[in-house]
Amino acid sequence: MAKKKAFTPLLYLASLVFLPWWISLSFNKSLESWVTNWWNTRQSEIFLNGIQEKNILEKFIELEEILLLEEMIKEYSETHLQNLRIGIHKETIQFIKIHNEDRIHTILHFSTNIICFVILSGYSIWGNEELVILNSWAQEFLYNLSDTIKAFSILLLTDLCIGFHSPHGWELIIGSVYKDFGFVHNDQILSGLVSTFPVILDTLFKFWIFRYLNRVSPSLVVIYHSMND
């Protein structure tokens, strides 16, 4: 009976790790045909944001420049001009296909992530008892560590998250999350998030040391500051 009680939280933890991957895979497959059909029948009513409109205009300006170039080379044979028109037509069709695939990818991934969040939230509420047991295990494990190891772990974690080289890591993490939701890449938004998110974390961490660690374990705070200096 005791082994079963100990095994249940571990099984719940493993399900929390693999459940998002399974949800993403299954819903991507099941929603793909529906989203594709919906986009192909309703795309004329979809509002494009400024970035999408800019990308579309840039592509069509390139095609317009090619057409102007065509007007400048009238002396070429009719066969050559006909091939040029066919090439422009094919490029236009290819561009429209790429645009449709990008929009379908955005809608599909955003919908899947929302569904995944809702399911995981409900699953966490349903498994509240297992989460309490896992939390008690984690607290017991941390309590048994020495203050030196705790201080070293905190220092390592803070250097990774808010250290000198952390913006490069945050750029990759935020960029991957941004891409996973299917949003259009925007350097200004990513740069703003990368420059502000570590600062917010640093402020919260210092507040946590001031309010919690100073009260619970003053010796740990002393060791941490000694190692940090």
Swiss-Prot record:
What molecular function terms (GO) are annotated for this protein? antiporter activity; proton transmembrane transporter activity
Q: How does it sit in the membrane?
A: Multi-pass membrane protein
The record's catalysed reaction(s) read:
K(+)(in) + H(+)(out) = K(+)(out) + H(+)(in)
Domain of life, per UniProt, equals Eukaryota
Spans through the membrane? 7-27, 114-134, 189-209
Pfam entry (one): CemA
Location comes to: Plastid, Chloroplast inner membrane
List the GO terms this entry assigns under cellular component, sorted alphabetically: chloroplast inner membrane
Keywords assigned by UniProt? Antiport, Chloroplast, Hydrogen ion transport, Ion transport, Membrane, Plastid, Plastid inner membrane, Potassium, Potassium transport, Transmembrane, Transmembrane helix, Transport
Give each disulfide bond as a residue pair.
none
Spell out the InterPro entries in the cross-references: CemA (IPR004282)
Q: What are the BP-aspect GO terms?
A: potassium ion transport
**In which family does this protein belong, per the annotation?**
Belongs to the CemA family.
The job of this chain, per UniProt, is described as: Contributes to K(+)/H(+) antiport activity by supporting proton efflux to control proton extrusion and homeostasis in chloroplasts in a light-dependent manner to modulate photosynthesis. Prevents excessive induction of non-photochemical quenching (NPQ) under continuous-light conditions. Indirectly promotes efficient inorganic carbon uptake into chloroplasts.
The name under which this protein is listed is: Potassium/proton antiporter CemA
The top of its lineage is: Eukaryota, Viridiplantae, Streptophyta, Embryophyta, Tracheophyta
